[in-house]
Amino acid sequence: MENVAVIGASPKPDRYSNKAIRLLSEYNHNPVPIAPKHEQIEGEKVYRSLKDIPEKIDTVTLYLGQARQDPIISDIIELAPKRVIFNPGTENKAVYKQLKEADIEVVEACTLVLLKTNRY
């Protein structure tokens, strides 16, 4: 079981970040939602920032567009996950370089597809 930070988590069931939280749980992973304005999503405690997470994070799955990523990149690097998944619409070549320099694997893929095709 992996601890997975879901950055850009939404309480709205039609949002992909919400679907990822549910599917991660279904596949026996521990989703850790990150959202500044919510207390709980899909029964999971929500953290306002990456710095608030008490446990080790194995994977970060990103649901924030490029324009909103800069403020959190140093926090992701400090968190030192094994990998960061850039879901469709979050691609950011400049950030890829920073993460790779910090020995963090960059995956450009859909978390939902990775889980459903057993490639997670």
State the predicted function of each range.
Residues T61-G65:
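Short glycine-/small-residue-rich Rossmann-like dinucleotide-binding loops
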Residues M1-I57, D70-N87, E91-Y120:
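Structural/interface elements that position substrates and couple domains in central-metabolism enzymes
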